[in-house]
Design a protein with these regions (language model features):
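Conserved beta-strand-loop-beta-strand hairpin that lines the nucleotide-binding pocket
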Residues: 1-8, 51-135
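STAS-typified acidic loop motif
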Residues: 4, 9-20
Length: 135
C-alpha cells in the first residue's frame, strides 16, 4: 500500500533561496526513492519565478512537495504576490529575449500545472508529474 509523503520549507525570496529549493527537492525526492531529475527542473523554474515576480523585501516563499498514494508528485511554490499571476497559457518570448521560457518548460514537463490564489496576499503556482518509486 502506498502512502503520501510531504515536505514543506520556507526559503528566502532570493537567488540563493531558489537554488536551495532545487537542491532540497532533489535530496528529498531521492530520500523517498522517487525520480528527481524532471522535478528538479520544475522546482528551479517555479522558485526562480517566485523570486523574480513574487518578491517582496523581507518575505519568503514556500516550497511544498507531496507524493500522493497514486504516485503523483505535486510541486507547489507559494509567494506573497497574488497580484502578479502567471498567464494560464504561457506565450513564447521574443527570439532574442534572455528570459520568459520558464513556464513553457514547466508546461512541457508537467502533466498539469496552474495557479491557486489565497489566502490573501498569497498565490501558489503548482505542477504535477508522475513519480513512480525508483527501482
Amino acid at each position: 500500500m502506498n502512502q503520501e509523503n510531504s515536505f514543506k520549507v520556507l526559503l528566502s525570496a532570493t537567488r540563493r533561496g531558489a537554488r536551495l529549493a532545487r537542491l532540497l527537492s532533489r535530496e528529498q525526492l531521492r530520500s523517498w526513492g522517487r525520480p528527481f531529475e524532471t522535478a528538479e527542473h520544475v522546482v528551479a523554474e517555479l522558485a526562480n519565478n517566485a523570486v523574480q515576480h513574487g518578491h517582496v523585501p523581507g518575505r519568503s516563499f514556500r516550497l511544498t512537495l507531496t507524493v500522493s498514494a497514486t504516485d503523483t508528485l505535486r510541486i507547489e511554490v507559494t509567494d506573497v504576490r497574488a497580484d502578479r499571476t502567471p498567464p494560464a497559457e504561457p506565450r513564447p518570448p521574443a527570439p532574442d529575449a534572455e528570459g520568459g521560457r520558464g513556464l513553457l518548460l514547466v508546461a512541457a514537463l508537467a502533466d498539469r500545472w496552474g495557479t491557486d490564489l489565497g489566502p490573501v496576499p498569497c498565490k501558489t503556482v503548482w505542477a504535477e508529474l508522475p513519480a513512480p518509486p525508483s527501482r
